[in-house]
């Protein structure tokens, strides 16, 4: 899309697939950040970091299995409220790129970036700013644009 069409609606979808994990791991001290970390829901692993995967822990393992595989595993119960609060904070952050930001819980932001292309010198530069900002905040996202 070129800058001459900068008033068109152009939706950017940001999916945060690791949000249940990252709402906890961003706050870990460096010594704990390298340990296996799992997120549990009804005593089952629903999310895990690379260290947990490397030890042999897998999605859907029960809590006892995870602890038997690694005694160093750090576990957290899934916290949907914390995830929604984090998604809301990410939406507030995204307002610097567009006044049209929509939350699609549990893990998606929609941003109308059509009117922002000229301000940010085109789609490539805008996406670079958004992606580096998300990375700087400590999150991982997958982006898609509806053209």
Go through the PLM ranges and name each one.
Residues 1-110, 115-117, 122-132, 136, ...:
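Residues that scaffold, gate, or flank divalent-cation-dependent active/transport sites
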